[in-house]
Every structure is written in C-alpha cells, then in structure tokens.
C-alpha cells in the first residue's frame, strides 16, 4: 500500500505494529499498518485515500476479538482513545462516538441523571463494538436505546441511518454491509444520578465476584443458546479448568477463556475454543456459537 497520502492526515500511522497490547486477551501478531485517526473527519480522509481492496480491521478496546499469531496483513483502524466524544443533547439523548468505552458511557449517562444505560458498565469494549454486536448484559441491550447511527464506508463516505434499516437480534446486527459505526444518538430515561451510580457500583462488584476480571480475557466467548446458558453447558461437560498451553477455561465462569499469566498464544486459545465446542456438541448435541471474532493469519510470518 502506498502510504504517501498519510502526510495529509492528522492521525498516527504505525507499521508492523504488535497487536497484543491492543487486545484484552493480550495475544496476536503484528498489523502491517495501524492507524489512529485524530477525529471522524480525519478518518474519512484517510479511508478515502486507501486502495479499495486494502484489507481493513476495526479495533476498539480489543475485547471480543482473537487476533491470530500471524497478525493482520492489512490496515487496522484503532478507535480507542481517538473517537471519544460524548455530547449531552436534548430529549434525554446522548451522542457518542465509536471509540468511547462502554464503561465511560455508563458513567456519563448516570452523571447526567439518565438511566437504563447502567448495564454498559459491565461490557469490556467500546460503543462501536457494542453497536456492531448489540452487546448487552443484566437485561439491557445496546440497540434498545438507539435513535440513529452514523456509519462510514471504505471510501470515507458518512451517512446517517435509522434502526429500522438494520436487523437487530441477540448479539447480532445485520444490514451494515461494508460500513462501520462511527457514532450513535441514544435516548435514555430520566433517572437519578446517585441511584444509577450505585447500580453501576453493584454491577461491577457482581462482575468481579463472578467473572475472572483479574485475568486476561475477552469477555464471553460463546453466545447463550436459546433457553440455556453457555457457561452451564460448558461446566456440565466438565470443562472448567481445562487448558491448552496457557489458555484455560476459567474456574470462575466457564464461558470465559483466560490467558493465564500472559503465557498463552492465540493458537492455544483458538484450539481451546474448538475443543470446548466439540465436547459440548458431543455431550449435549448443542452447537455453541462464538461471540468472539477470530481474525488474521494463523502462521507467524517474517516481515
């Protein structure tokens, strides 16, 4: 890729950049290129100058993603720390950019006396990722609050879209096509600051008690099948504590795979994911569907 046009951009372009530090599993090989946009306009300019066939990967906080050990041979767009504006609007609405962490969004809405966004505190990702997969927990889902979204395509063209243009389901949003979410307008419910902040505190305490928050993990690995829970199925198959290399099925919550003390490779984690799926299928006839996106090249290459 000819990167001479980047001199006109305001963001930061890095080459052969290790991706492990940008993911919550702390694994993954390097990206051929990684771009940190200065703002949405800068992102649009950068994309407009990219070759149309350039492979693109969008990363927020790097949860819900397994980057393989061979890395990614295209360009990674990093939104965390970049697209981070939150604006309080009228009618109990907030405009939030894709790089804002879900936890920050939860606190911002609570401090502005808005409720029904407290659940975001329990999601270890960005709002862009939450929009992409309709992330949720504790009875809340992201798209229950969406009024409109802004998307951008690989030409750098931005447009505003309404929820009815998408098919939104449990941990799935269809209809995005070759576009990415860059911001959203969300409508919440009038609430009480102290009540919401206490709810967030309680939620985080429950999360720390029931999930391996002190270990490298990506969040839930599998979707819950209809009428059941992935964690229950995995535990019922005797898979808690099962390991491949440094990848371990958490003893605390069976739907989490941890990178124990940072010793796992992406290949270890991917192999353990497949092992869990196989054992659950063999013992229960239920196919666990991944929430995690597996990305990149399996083989480590010399660049």
Swiss-Prot record:
Pathway the protein takes part in: Cell wall biogenesis; peptidoglycan biosynthesis
Keywords: Cell cycle, Cell division, Cell shape, Cell wall biogenesis/degradation, Cytoplasm, FAD, Flavoprotein, NADP, Oxidoreductase, Peptidoglycan synthesis
Entry coiled-coil feature ranges: none
Residue positions of the active site: 171, 220 (proton donor), 291
Cofactor entry: FAD
GO terms under cellular component: cytosol
Residue ranges constituting the FAD-binding PCMH-type domain according to the UniProt record: 27-191
Molecular-function annotations in GO: FAD binding; UDP-N-acetylmuramate dehydrogenase activity
Protein name, entry field: UDP-N-acetylenolpyruvoylglucosamine reductase
Organism for this UniProt entry: Legionella pneumophila (strain Paris)
